[in-house]
Regions:
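Short, polar/acidic, helix-capping and beta-turn segments at strand->helix junctions
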Residues: 1-129
C-alpha cells in the first residue's frame, strides 16, 4: 500500500504546505536527508497556554495538525512522493504551557501518532518534548 493509499484509507487530506513566515526556507534536501523548518499550529488552533486557556485534548489536536503540515511539506519537498521517506528521525516539540503543566509529551503525541498512523514503522522517531 502506498502512503497516499494509506492517507485515503484513514480519510486524511493533507493541507496545503505553509509558506515561510520570515527569511528562511521551509525545507532543505541534502543528499538523502530532508530537513523541515519548525512548524506551528494552524490559525484554527486555539490560542493560549495549555493547562490554562487550552485543554490537553485541543493541544493534542493542534499537534496532530502540525504533524499533517509536516507531511504536506515533505510531500512537496519529495516531488509528491511520500513513499520516498525511508524513516522519520526526530520530532522536536515545543508547547506553550501554564507554569504547572507537566504533560508536554501527551501534547506532542498528537504529532507522533499521526506520523505513525500514516507512515507506519517509517514514522517512528526519536523525540524531545
Amino acid at each position: 500500500m502506498t502512503t497516499d493509499d494509506r492517507l485515503n484509507e484513514l480519510g486524511i487530506e493533507l493541507p496545503n504546505p505553509i509558506q515561510p513566515a520570515a527569511n528562511y526556507v521551509r525545507h532543505w534536501r541534502t543528499g538523502n536527508l530532508l530537513f523541515i523548518s519548525g512548524t506551528g499550529p494552524t490559525d484554527r488552533s486555539p490560542k493560549g497556554k495549555v493547562g490554562a486557556d487550552v485543554s490537553l485534548d485541543d493541544a493534542y489536536q493542534a499537534a496532530r495538525d502540525v504533524g499533517l503540515q509536516i507531511l504536506a511539506t515533505a510531500k512537496e519537498a519529495l516531488d509528491g512522493d511520500l513513499d520516498r521517506i525511508v524513516h522519520a528521525v526526530k520530532v522536536l516539540g515545543m508547547v506553550n504551557t501554564a507554569p504547572d503543566f507537566l504533560e508536554h509529551p501527551k501534547v506532542i503525541n498528537g504529532c507522533s501518532d499521526v506520523l505513525v498512523e500514516v507512515l507506519g514503522e517509517r514514522g517512528r522517531h526519536t523525540r524531545s518534548a
